[in-house]
Amino acid sequence: MQTAASCYNEIESMKLAIVLSGSQAEINWNALRLANLAMGKGDKVAIFLVGEGVEYEHYNSDQFDIKKQVERFLDAGGEIIACGTCLDLRKQAESAVCPAGRLDDWYRLISESDKVLTF
């Protein structure tokens, strides 16, 4: 008899889009941890930053080491795109870990993904 846990092991890899829209360090840290777990299981993961989510770098701490999670995610081939308008509204420049994108990029991530998670 198959258990629920063994059924999960048979799931094919998927494309996962994660939308970060807030600035709460713990929530963003957990979203990034999930993204890294999914990447480790062979899934393709992309993150779109919108609203306060574009400020995620500013909320790094010893307890919630967001920078470490981001480095791990990018090193594994993950993609991060930030809403360019949201960056502009906050007078924040794009960076290697927060590159500017457009609504077209957000739409592409959603339409090409098997699952979309929002945090």
Q: What do these predicted ranges mean?
A:
Residues 16-29, 54-61:
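Short, glycine-rich nucleotide/cofactor-binding loops
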Residues 35, 45-51, 80-84:
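Short internal beta-strands
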Residues 63-89:
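A glycine-rich helix N-cap at a beta->alpha junction
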